[in-house]
Amino acid sequence: EWIIDGERFTLHGAIDDATGEVLALFFAKNECLDAYFEVLRQILVNYGIPLSVYVDKHTIFLSPKFGKLSVEDELAGKRVNDTQFGRALKELGITLIPANSPQTKGRIERLWGTLQSRLPVEFKLAGIKSIEAANAFLQKFMEVYNQKFAVSPANRESAFRELPKAVNLDHILCLKEFRKVDNSSVIRIRYFLFH
């Protein structure tokens, strides 16, 4: 949680596990799907499609039922529905890897510690007073940070695939609801009917 000019915000981000390079950072009013979609968009546009994404077990990434189906349920063909984030990753061909303990997320946790000590000072020096200014500043900050701290990967083979020009990210990084149209051409979303 961050305070910018008296308001609280949440920082979302991603780091390359092989290099320590900060791939994306984004502030939002709270931890939310839209902010994680923005982080993913930054990665896709600037680096391409990652082969995999390592995430914690937040319900934005994984259904609360993830890993809880019995063998009988699995044999009966039942499955846990993807979250919207999980669905977007599948559409992009990205493997989602859930972290099983905080220790397995060492790099990102160390990054948060570094950012919590450095960014407030940087914001003050730059006169940052709004979330918009903070997000714009983060783009420049990442460049400087990565030049200073990122390292060469042990394996030179890229873990990113090129993002095809034909891919419209607005059609993937969005909410999608699948519904059936009834006989009177009506769909229901929760308690609402649409004609």
Give short role names for the model-derived ranges:
Residues 142-195:
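C-terminal, beta-rich DNA-binding module of retroviral/retroelements integrases
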Residues 2-11, 19-133:
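RNase H-like DDE/DDD metal-dependent nuclease/strand-transfer catalytic core used by mobile genetic elements
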Residues 18-19, 190:
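Residue-level recognition of short loop/turn positions
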Residues 117-124, 128, 139-154:
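Short helix-capping and hinge/turn segments at secondary-structure transitions, especially at repeat
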